[in-house]
Every structure is written in structure tokens, then in C-alpha cells.
Amino acid sequence: MGKEAPAIGIDLGTTYSCVGVWQNDRVEIIANDQGNRTTPSYVAFTDTERLIGDAAKNQVAMNPRHTVFDAKRLIGRKFSDPIVQADIKLWPFQVRAGAHDVPEIVVSYKNEEKVFKAEEISSMVLIKMKETAQASLGADREVKKAVVTVPAYFNDSQRQATKDAGMIAGLEVLRIINEPTAAAISYGLDKKDSGLGERNVLIFDLGGGTFDVSLLTIEEGIFEVKATAGDTHLGGEDFDERLVNHFANEFQRKYKKDLKTSPRALRRLRTACERAKRTLSSAAQTTIELDSLFEGVDFATSITRARFEELCMDLFRKCMDPVEKCLHDAKMDKMTVHDVVLVGGSTRIPKVQQLLQDFFNGKELNKSINPDEAVAYGAAVQAAILTGEGGEKVQDLLLLDVTPLSLGLETAGGVMTVLIPRNTTIPTKKEQVFSTYSDNQPGVLIQVYEGERARTKDNNLLGKFELTGIPPAPRGVPQINVIFDIDANGILNVSAEDKTTGNKNKITITNDKGRLSKDEIERMVQEAEKYKADDEQLKKVEAKNSLENYAYNMRNTIREDKVASQLSASDKESMEKALTAAMDWLEANQMAEVEEFEHHLKELEGLCNPIITRLYQGGAGAGGMPGGGAGAGAAPSGGSGAGPKIEEVD
């Protein structure tokens, strides 16, 4: 590969991901090999291959136990986290506790048990997005750098784990940025020179798995986040879950059968519910029809929009709390908000729009940006800014983001002493002097927490370290200087220094237990390479088989009496010659590249197909296409060559 490709922007979503790049003075959102501009955040493992994206999601009903999704709801969380425990009950794939209470996902791949961390699954989705961009930008320019987005309300460990996922995917993560802030860029970029002056903009971002609200002021290309609030576990999937439960109960009532015992039935139902939910955003009623859903029972039923709203009403209302909190934190009245901007697929739900509009006293909501693509768009702009690519159109944009949670340390009696309050603009650095609690105390334990509660036990411990070697002195005399430093990714470094001795100790909070070590990341990078090689190998085998099948089927066809008698001698000779040549080449080049196999197949088809077609039109009538359709069937399927061989249509 020659020169480096431009840096890309990736929206790594709970349910779908999206990638964009700044090109030709604007952002281009890149479609994947299936022609879709968003890609399911799904990874599937089978006896023969690994599938990512559409191919993985399309076969999920056939393979629910080994198709992994929702990695974003696991990343940076502990196994014992109540949220993780609740999710495990809903997932068809197996999650168990690993070392340091880190969740591990267990699947079977090529008939062997494999164990993955959430970072690894996310890295596979990132690799897919990277490859999507790569295919569009051309093989001569290698994609290396990316800006990756996270929910604004993600905490320190979730951010760090996302950054690690990027490293495992072989990407240099230039910056982790917040999703609503990225969406705000997408919204504000075209208004930069509109002369409107300062605008207060509320971004309401409700996606597949997470929810964020951010309030920004945008003026002349300066995007300043005033406050942010949200829920890292609220989104479209939770609405789907309500529908699944509703219909599972209905099924139980009607047929006295519990379909929840079958992962496959449950998955088919969930897919139908997701579809029904989308339909209900534009229709007042919809039906669900699933043949032979469970124990031979055909399930046909319907649901109205009103019933769906009733099932999810508490969740919809829950979306309004962060809006209030955000305004309160920004010390802003709702009447002073100029624009309320919708982002994320779930903002298409009419009831959510209505509640939000009512909250803002009937104000028109702004739907000017694409809710599925705005985040990747903003990330691509930020990537261009950070690499100096974007030209004057974007280079003078300035993003001022904030840290979502208060950060501090534990002082005597388990009290949370805050050094950096929530919604502080980042990057930032804060110092404070502490002292010992008892006479002649030789060391102090610095425990770092994030959260809003007064006592540390109610907050989240990010990490701890000791500062030792303090000379004997009465309590309160030693001076220990503690420095909290948050970088532009929202990731925290803490250091402490004993002023008398100059003893220092520091931690990047992320060295906390459960964080991947350098060695682990290195190992995962190598494994990612290995899986990629596996995928490549499979494509090779498929391409080789296609050529081989075609050649042998075609030779058998032209040797059949029916066909042979119709062929002119010259046609037969040229075909025999070409087929023998192809078989000889195959024999000698078992390890050729995919492109070579495909090239030979094309050449062969170019010669043989017209002759055979002429023959059939002339009425040789030899039962269908040769060899059961070698002509069509032998070509690699669907561009990617790795699509599922069969899929269920609900």
C-alpha cells in the first residue's frame, strides 16, 4: 500500500455502526459491501467462519448462541454490575465472569470454545468499519487513523476500553469524542456562516442502546458543551424487549407454551418486534406473522401504536429526566433553547417526539440531520480537523466538551472529596493538597472515584494507589499534592507527590483491575490478524471451489450426448481446450489469490456461457442450466463472498 488514507470517523453503536470520511471538501458516509450505510454491530461464529455485520445479523435466528451483539452494553463494565446481570438473562450467548470480575463472552468457532472480552468483539466491528472505508478509498491508501465516538455519559473505564478496542483493530485512535457533540458538528457545520449569532442547541440522542442529552452553545464554529446527562443503558433495544415480553405472554396465554425456552423462537420474535416497532412509527397498527414459531405453532397477531406506547411509556418518560437535569446543570431555562435536535434511530418514535415537544411547550423539533448518520458525520469532521485535512471549511472549528461525572478521592470517613465537578470543560487539570490523618503515618492510600454521591461507597471506584515513604510527622503536617488531569478523550490521569521528600506516584486510572494490559492488547492484536487471515483463507477456498465446480460441471455438460451432438466442432474444441487449461492451472495454483481465481472464472464464463446459451435457445433442452446452474451458482455470492449460504425470511 502506498500513501496513507485520510483519517475516518466511526460511530460504534450498540446495534448499528456507521463510518464516514472527509473527502472532496465534504463528509462522505460510506456504504458497506451490502450497499448499506449502517452496519449491524454483530459478530457471528460458525463451524467454518466468522461473520461480521449484515451477514452475522442475517443468520442470527439459525445460530443464536454464537452470534454476539450488544458488546457496547458490556464494554468497560464489571461482570457483577447489576446492569450486566440483567442483560445476561436476555442474551442468547453465554457470558461468564473472568479474572478481576471482567465479563467474558463464550462462543464456539470451528468447533472449538473461544473466549472473548467485549473489547475484542467491538474491535471486530471496528475492523469491519475500517474495511468498509478501505474498500471505498482504494487499496493503495491504507486506513490507519480514526476518531471513534462514545456516549457522552460513558465513564472512564468505558472510554478507555473503547480506545483499546480501536488499538486491537489496528487503528490509531486519534480521539474519543462524545456522540451528541459529534452530532452537533453535523448540525452546526452548515450553519457556520449563517450569521445567526450564538445558538443554544439541545441534542437529544436516543439510539439502540444508549441515551444522551447535551446542551451546547454554537457560535461562529465554536461548539461549547455546557452540560450533558443521559443513561448508558436505555434505547431501542429496551423498547423491543417490552414488545417481546408482551407477545411471549400472549403466546403463553393462547397456546399454553413458553417460547422463552427456545433461543431461536425468541430471536425470530425479537426480529419481528424490531420490525413492528419501526412500522408503528409511521402506521397506527401492524401485524406479526411467524410460521411455526415454537413447537409447530404458527403465530399471527397484531399491535396498535397506542398499545406499544403504553408498554413503553415509563421508558419514554424516563427520557425526559436527563433533559431537565441537563438544563438545570447548564443553569439555563428551557425557553432559551433555540433548537432541539433529534439524533439516533429511536427519535423516530412519535411518542418520544411528542413528549419532548410538550416539554419544550410545543416548540417545533429540528429534524434536519440524518439521525442514523449524524454521529459518524461529526466524527469524520473531527478526524479531518485533527489531521489537518479539512481545509478552511472546518479547520477553525473548535470543540469544547465536558466530563460527564464528578471526579474526586476518598477522604477520612469515606467522604467523596470532589476535585473536578461534572460538566467541567476538558482537557483540564486540578491540584489540591491533602495531609495525613494520624501521627507518624508512613503512607497514604489514594482512592479515585467518579460519581455524584456524598459517600464514596455509593460512587464508582476508578482506581487506587499508595504513596509511601512519608517521614514521621504529626497528623496534618505532611503536604501531599494530588493532581487530577483529564485529557481530551475524557480519560483521567492522577498523580500524587509528597512535597517534603519529592516522592511521586501516579496512575492512569485505566490501569485499574479489569483494564486490558499492554500484553493482552498485543495478544489480541495478533489474534485479530489471525482471524482476518482465517477470513481471507475462507474467501480463497470459496473462490477456488467456484472455479473448480464451474469447470468440472461444464466439462460434464458438453460431454453429455444430448449437448455434444448439438455443439459445433469448433465450439466444442475451444471449450474443451479452455476447460482443460483452467483445470491444469488450478492443479498448479492451489494457493492463488482470490482475484486470480475470480479472473479465471470470468474468462471461462465469458467463453462458455454464450455458447451454451445459444445452444439452449436453439432448443437442446438439456434440463435446465448445466450442472444445476453452475453458471450462476458458481460465482462468488454477494460481492463479499462471505455472506450466509442460506437465510431465513420471516
UniProtKB/Swiss-Prot annotation:
Q: Which UniProt keywords apply?
A: ATP-binding, Nucleotide-binding, Stress response
Induction annotation: By light as well as by elevated temperature.
Instruction: Region Disordered: list its residue ranges.
Output: 623-650
GO cellular component terms attached to this protein's record:
axonemal central pair projection
**Which PROSITE patterns does this UniProt record tie to the protein?**
HSP70_1 (PS00297), HSP70_2 (PS00329), HSP70_3 (PS01036)
Q: Where is the composition biased (Gly residues)?
A: 623-642
Which CDD domains has this protein been placed in? ASKHA_NBD_HSP70_HSPA1
Q: Which GO terms describe its molecular function?
A: ATP binding; ATP-dependent protein folding chaperone
Give the top-rank taxon of the lineage listed in the UniProt record for this protein. Answer: Eukaryota
Q: Which NCBIfam families match?
A: PRK00290.1
Family membership, please give it.
Belongs to the heat shock protein 70 family.
Q: Which PANTHER family match?
A: HEAT SHOCK PROTEIN 70KDA
Output this protein's name: Heat shock 70 kDa protein
